[in-house]
């Protein structure tokens, strides 16, 4: 393997570790870190050997780098001078609930630092990388960059666009209706329903329109997966009777990094028409009805990102 392939291999491990923080790291990003020493120290493994690894378990506790260094055995500490630390997100450079990770990396004296992507948080934004480089440590940035950014898509959207990452989600019949002449339809299978609850556990808030709330009284909580219930939001009407998608809810001050919209057609279409979406998830059942409410109209030129066949249903995902 060449160096790029080695770097990508260990960055994939960082991403794998980072995902373990999905539930408890919020509102912090998910981050994984791996410490690697050259092959001669640990047999003949091509590309080196891991002597430490960790991930950000819970907001307010040690970051991935802290946990990775803590996992290094005392008898391996002397190897750090020749080690490379891989981190899926730029090491922090500020004092928050924990000290700066860039200072820890410098203090441990590693030879090289490989970073997946730059942290968009205003107090970091390249400062961690700069500090580490100024200390004489070699830094490589941008290894599996898109994958690292995608892992924390909600965190990135919140800090770059000052609004939540917005997922629009609905289920429809094979002939494009979301209800049966105004009556609710059971279109998900037990398994795809579980997937929806898993999604809910990953989002900070979930929103429906007033009409859906009054007609269906949805619980909008997490029942068939584990994790916290999202904040429940019912989108009301302003004085002109229009959907209030310009509400201060979308402001940075609310602290919501992600929002799932499960409303009826009017609510979903208002988000689409306003361009307030990042991802659209549509579950299509093989069932058909003779009439009802038509599914929302997708934006012109939208690109399909993923298509899954699950229990006879088709789940399509679109992203901007």
Residue ranges and their predicted role:
Residues 2-29, 52, 76, 97, ...:
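Enzymes that bind and transform nitrogen-containing heteroaromatic metabolites
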Residues 32:
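Helix-turn-helix
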Residues 142-159:
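Short, structured interface segments
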Residues 124-125, 151-152, 219, 290:
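Short Asp/Glu-rich motifs
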Residues 35-147, 231, 270-272:
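Zn2+-dependent cytidine deaminase-like catalytic core
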